[in-house]
Swiss-Prot record:
It comes from Escherichia coli (strain SMS-3-5 / SECEC). It holds the Pfam family DHDPS. Keywords: Carbohydrate metabolism, Cytoplasm, Lyase, Schiff base. Its main location: cytoplasm. Catalyzes the reversible aldol cleavage of N-acetylneuraminic acid (sialic acid; Neu5Ac) to form pyruvate and N-acetylmannosamine (ManNAc) via a Schiff base intermediate. Homotetramer. One of its GO terms (molecular function) is N-acetylneuraminate lyase activity. The gene is nanA. Its EC number is 4.1.3.3. It catalyses: aceneuramate = aldehydo-N-acetyl-D-mannosamine + pyruvate. InterPro entries: Aldolase_TIM, DapA-like, NanA, Schiff_base-form_aldolases_AS, Schiff_base-form_aldolases_CS. This is N-acetylneuraminate lyase.
């Protein structure tokens, strides 16, 4: 059901203007930039997209704009997860209406929900998605929900689930999931271990830094398919040098600043309470943007 979802999917950023409103023109440019750099698909409205500091209406607007720009060109996954099941269902129905290829949802967080409540949450979203496959989103470091291997196995075998986004550094668990579910579409979620995640069994990845250097991650996939571990490791090292800088600057605001210097995003701001990039990092980010533009050609 979800085998066509394998690949390298950029976790799409959401541009805002100086007044903190959605910057629709920059969003359209960013979608086109990702298409042009050879990405396989977009994961829209997730952590990187600052979904949880947006209203439901804004999240729907983002889904609609992305679909207008990219439907039929690349694969589209709508992250519809909210703490509220009803709001998640509303977004899932919108994703279906706009023509997305799949929906995704993080485990409901903040309140200590039981595991059966988590399962019921996913079942309800799957029902509202009306046939779109579900990508379960496991990100314990941010959600605070630490699923056991048995619980993951239960979630990914719910009717309608076709994939798992595994944002965890536990590569042993990644391999265990692959061993248990050979046909499951499995995404690596941490960009800094992309090559290792593929070797542990992932089919591809969903990541924030793909927005600025997606071709490098495609290069890792190609190298590993050809058995060229040395090239894959070299590319991963180059990606990780970028990630080192972004961790210092703040990942989302750092990415937006690089894209600003690339003339893709007009205003390099995240939505409050996120603050701007410290000015001392601007020269490094500008140099990075120039390096990546030259590398991309």
């Amino acid at each position: 059901m979800a085998t066509n979802l394998r690949g390298v999917m950029a976790a799409l950023l959401t541009p805002f203007d100086q007044q903190q409103a959605l910057d629709k023109a920059s969003l359209r440019r960013l979608v086109q930039f990702n298409i042009q750099q050879g990405i396989d698909g977009l994961y829209v409205g997730g952590s990187t997209g600052e979904a949880f500091v947006q209203s439901l209406s804004e999240r729907e607007q983002v889904l609609e704009i992305v679909a207008e720009e990219a439907k039929g060109k690349i694969k589209l996954i709508a992250h519809v997860g909210c703490v509220s099941t009803a709001e998640s269902q509303q977004l899932a129905a919108s994703a279906k209406r706009y023509g997305f290829d799949a929906v995704s949802a993080v485990t409901p967080f903040y309140y200590p929900f039981s595991f059966e409540e988590h399962c019921d949450h996913y079942r309800a979203i799957i029902d509202s998605a009306d046939g779109l496959p579900m990508v379960v989103y496991n990100i314990p470091a941010l959600s605070g929900v630490k699923l056991s291997l048995d619980q993951i196995n239960t979630l990914v075998t719910l009717p309608g689930v076709g994939a798992l986004k595994q944002t965890s550094g536990d590569l042993y668990q990644m391999e265990q999931i692959r061993r248990e579910h050979p046909d499951l579409v499995l995404y690596n979620g941490y960009d800094e271990i992309f090559a290792s995640g593929l070797l542990a069994g992932a089919d591809g990845g969903i990541g924030s830094t793909y927005n600025i250097m997606g071709w490098r991650y495609q290069g890792i996939v190609k190298a590993l398919k050809e058995g060229d571990i040395q090239t894959a490791q070299k590319l991963q090292t180059e990606c990780n040098k970028v990630i080192d800088l972004l961790i210092k600057t703040g990942v989302f605001r750092g990415l937006k600043t690089v894209l600003h210097y690339m003339d893709v995003v007009s205003v390099p701001l995240c939505r409050k309470p996120f603050g701007p990039v410290d000015e001392k990092y601007l020269p490094e980010l500008k140099a990075l943007a120039q390096q990546l533009m030259q590398e991309r050609g």
